[in-house]
């Protein structure tokens, strides 16, 4: 633990210097003229959106904003049960056909009425999108029955279809605008949601205004602003000074301080987010091509100590990519438990008794992930593995990897937007998925995953996911580290804000009474 503390102290000092420099260069992050008004709520997050069109860019920062502009056919209640939304009712015509009946009189922000044609156009477009087609791998086609009725046809029976339709990436877009200009949503997104787009300044903010014709009723606050504040500590400071009202991803080290301040509080609840290390199974570092080496890396990691030292206990050690609370989560010990001698034994068997050198790419804007990687660097040194931690811009990192650039390993976080194991497993193990950054390819695992999609018995489907997790604990293309607690800081005057494990927050019922 002394080594862990020393490693953390080093990275925190470095990050503190970077933060101070960043603050001097970016005073505009300090506030806006509207921050103090009761008719405005300002929330801050670490990253900017990649696009206002989530078929073009889908990072978490994107759907944190777009989920307030666009509506889905169905959604979740506070207990993650599927409830009506744009679709007021539905029924299964057979195992692979779901008929849905739309609400009448729902208007897009430009006054045009939502119809079944918009649903079909949106999903056809999604299936042809390089960015989100993986999220619709289960979808065969959409049929328009009449103006307010559609049939969702799946590729065979797809048990979690309703959960898939709750995904913020399944929001409905306007056919009449996209037919005229396929890039219309990138500059002026128009949905049916509680907020309308006003303005975006890239790298700084997105401003929204309440939809006065929202089908769901009166929106609680007139203006909503998303502020980009990369430094986690700066988000906490802005919350304390009242320059923002809500801060996403509060650093665990700030929780106690914010909770003792009468003007602020930190909301905490389990999430479906899992933090893990992606190992490139085709890396130019040949050692990483051997599953025994990848297992050894996990055996060398003390996940309990990692959660304690980096997350201050606001995380749970993870055994698989399927997070706590997600359907298919296996709470049995399928992970490779911390065992230094076992790690050394596996390295020796693989031909690396003295270890080897590797690099880990980590998002430069994420203080917590950088701290974690420095601790991992220290832990892996105990078995002779020399790790170079290389911070870089997250977007550059993702683009480099997706385009086939060589790398050894990178820090990764997966947001399960469906609450189902199928979502995270398909994205990360399918050879066709752009999210399969490890280049993992196991036909047996893929066959099991596809077969599980049609199982209607929950116990049978969960058993398949458990089997898949066990196989992946041996192959280990991904090394799961922890499942996150949601940590969101709020000002005392804010009411109506509710955490959810999906972490895409809606604001129609959030008021600012400060």
Stretches found by the model and what they are:
Residues 116-122, 147-151, 193-194, 221-223, ...:
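Alpha-helical secondary-structure segments
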Residues 388-397, 423-491, 514:
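Extracytoplasmic/peripheral linker and loop segments enriched in polar/acidic and small residues
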Residues 316-349, 366-369:
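Structural transition elements
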Residues 488-514:
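Long beta-strand-rich cores associated with HINT superfamily self-processing modules
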Residues 212-257:
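Ligand-site clamp/hinge motif
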Residues 44-94, 124, 190, 489:
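N-terminal lobe/hinge region of extracytoplasmic solute-binding protein
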